[in-house]
Amino acid sequence: MKSIIINFVRLYQKWISPLFPPSCRYRPTCSTYMIEAVEKHGIKGVLMGIARILRCHPFVEGGEDPVPDEFTLRRNPQKGKK
């Protein structure tokens, strides 16, 4: 199941994402975050990725936000704001 989700995100990165200007406010990008979260936390990583996408909007500062070692739907507290 993990590989299906990861391949779906990679298809998005290759074929859909290049059609639009870069807009992710975080590093790593939201799609890369989703892949890393699924690799690290399995299916729960999908929830983490969706939560990340929902926090990626013009009213947030953005910056570094790597996938945390512990499952959480919040921004990584160790790497918080710049």
UniProtKB/Swiss-Prot annotation:
GO terms for cellular component: plasma membrane. Its main location: membrane. It comes from the Bacteria. It is a peripheral membrane protein. Keywords: Cell membrane, Membrane. It is found in: Cell membrane. Could be involved in insertion of integral membrane proteins into the membrane. HAMAP family: UPF0161_YidD (MF_00386). Belongs to the UPF0161 family. This is Putative membrane protein insertion efficiency factor. It comes from Streptococcus uberis (strain ATCC BAA-854 / 0140J).
